[in-house]
């Protein structure tokens, strides 16, 4: 239930109700953030997106207690004259819009660059010109490769955190060669970050930049052939979920050796709410939002997901639960990757007092329970062969 009474920020100051223009509100992160804002705060949401499937439960029926606090506007920010007017109506703009699926980075590099840089330019411009605060969602991909990845594999410094832990104010952004179009996303995201930062420095734009480190949970991406294109390749959680639902081996790109950290969407949304409601502490900062305690290789993630799914579904694992594939075979020509992505949490902990809470096992159990409940029957119907007459 929304509770506007006696809400105070981290410094004990009363929190005033805001009108928030959320661009990309219909996506994975946007849907969870809308839920949080509507059920636990008095804030109003102008929800902008091309699709609203993931927030329909918040828009219908009109009798829900927050019906007067959310408006959905079907907008493609590429070419819609309504965007500036909606920005002017708001106190805060949150830009979540992006192409953020690795399979697209080197197969659709132009769309990736336009979506993440060119299409975001008007949002930054309107915020700066109209003195509106902006929370811009970037990505941990802006860090690119770690310094340690350039050392020999047996070099002792590869285990030194100084060579792989990623810090917002210190770590360099290291990308692959131009032919490796996988970095089109990271470059576009880094450039829009630099523009936002420059608008703050030169024109006084109030901004916060968020760098998510693998946020996962219910409603992430899609299951190919069920609520997304059959040929689509979603991110790793949905890819592995799709394999588990179809009782297929989980595909490990280049052996699944890359190391990643994963944070539960509910924990991450708590961090975003702190940014929204503590502008004096968040303005001008870039925040890593991840969980360094949940570090695994992609192979270990696959093994854990197989174990968790067997528990929540009651189905035993298949005989060969994983299969190795090359990155060229899976993603196409021009793919490249980083070896590790481990966030340093010093700044967000100091400014906002935020720390993630949910273990990898618990977040996978919650997420895969949702995946099984939501998709198992549909996948079964889609994969069952018609009975011969």
UniProtKB/Swiss-Prot annotation:
Essential cofactor(s): NAD(+)
Localization per record: Cytoplasm
Effect of residue 139 to V: Strongly reduced activity and accumulation of the UDP-4-keto-xylose intermediate
Molecular function GO labels: identical protein binding; NAD binding; protein heterodimerization activity; protein homodimerization activity; UDP-D-apiose synthase activity; UDP-glucuronate decarboxylase activity
Activity regulation (UniProt): Inhibited by UDP-D-galacturonate.
Effect listed in the UniProt record for changing residue 140 to S: Reduced activity. Reduced activity, produces mainly UDP-D-xylose over UDP-D-apiose
Tissue: Widely expressed with stronger expression in leaves and stems, and lower levels in flowers, siliques, pistils, pollen and roots.
Protein name, UniProt field: UDP-D-apiose/UDP-D-xylose synthase 1
Pfam families membership: Epimerase
EC number: 4.1.1.35
Binding site for UDP-alpha-D-glucuronate: 105, 139, 141, 182, 185, 214, 251, 253, 260, 331, 335, 337, 341
Residues annotated for NAD(+) binding in this entry: 28-29, 49, 76-77, 96, 185, 189, 215, 235
Signal peptide feature range: none
Subunit and partners: Homodimer and heterodimer with AXS2.
Name of the gene encoding the protein in the UniProt record: AXS1
Coiled coil: none
Function as written in the Swiss-Prot or TrEMBL entry: Together with AXS2, catalyzes the conversion of UDP-D-glucuronate into a mixture of UDP-D-apiose (UDP-Api) as the main product and UDP-D-xylose to a lesser extent, via a cycle of oxidation and reduction. D-Apiose (3-C-hydroxymethyl-d-erythrose) is the only plant cell wall monosaccharide with a branched carbon skeleton and is found in rhamnogalacturonan II (RG-II), apiogalacturonan, and several apioglycosides.
One of the GO BP terms on file: UDP-D-apiose biosynthetic process
Major subcellular site: cytoplasm
UniProt KW keywords: Cell wall biogenesis/degradation, Cytoplasm, Lyase, NAD
Species: Arabidopsis thaliana (Mouse-ear cress)
Cellular component terms (Gene Ontology): cytoplasm; cytosol; peroxisome
């Amino acid at each position: 239930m929304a509770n506007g009474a006696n809400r105070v920020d981290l410094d004990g100051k009363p929190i005033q109700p805001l009108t928030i223009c959320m661009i990309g509100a219909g996506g994975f992160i946007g849907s969870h953030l809308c839920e949080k804002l509507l059920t636990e705060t008095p804030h109003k949401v102008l929800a902008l997106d091309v699709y609203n499937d993931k927030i329909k439960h918040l828009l219908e029926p009109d009798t829900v207690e927050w019906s007067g606090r959310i408006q959905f506007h079907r907008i493609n920010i590429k070419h819609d004259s309504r965007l500036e007017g909606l920005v002017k109506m708001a106190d805060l703009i949150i830009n979540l819009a992006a192409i953020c699926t690795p399979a697209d980075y080197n197969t659709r590099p132009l769309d990736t660059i336009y979506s993440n840089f060119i299409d975001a330019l008007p949002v930054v411009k309107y915020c700066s010109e109209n003195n509106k605060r902006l929370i811009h969602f970037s990505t941990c991909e802006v860090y690119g490769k770690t310094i340690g990845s350039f050392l020999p594999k047996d070099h002792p410094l590869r285990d030194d955190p100084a060579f792989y832990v990623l810090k917002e104010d210190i770590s360099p952004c290291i990308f692959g060669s131009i032919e490796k179009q996988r970095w089109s996303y990271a470059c576009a995201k880094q450039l829009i970050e630099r523009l936002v930062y420059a608008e703050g420095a030169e024109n006084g734009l109030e901004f916060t930049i968020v760098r998510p480190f693998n946020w996962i949970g219910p409603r992430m991406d899609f299951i190919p052939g069920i609520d997304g294109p059959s040929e689509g390749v979603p991110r790793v959680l949905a890819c592995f979920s799709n394999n588990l639902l179809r009782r297929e081996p989980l595909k490990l790109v280049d052996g699944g050796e890359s190391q990643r950290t994963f944070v539960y969407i509910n924990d991450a949304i708590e961090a975003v709410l702190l940014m929204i409601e503590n502008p004096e502490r968040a303005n001008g900062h870039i925040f890593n939002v991840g969980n360094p305690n949940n570090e695994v290789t992609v192979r270990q993630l696959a093994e854990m997901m197989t174990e968790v799914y067997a528990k929540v579904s009651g189905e035993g694992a298949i005989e060969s639960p994983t299969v190795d594939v090359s990155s060229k075979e899976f993603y196409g020509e021009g793919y490249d990757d980083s070896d590790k992505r481990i966030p340093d949490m010093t700044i967000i902990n100091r400014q906002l007092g935020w720390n993630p809470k949910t273990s990898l096992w618990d977040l996978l159990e919650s997420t895969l329970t949702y995946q099984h409940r939501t998709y198992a029957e549909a996948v079964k119907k889609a994969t069952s062969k018609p009975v011969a007459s």
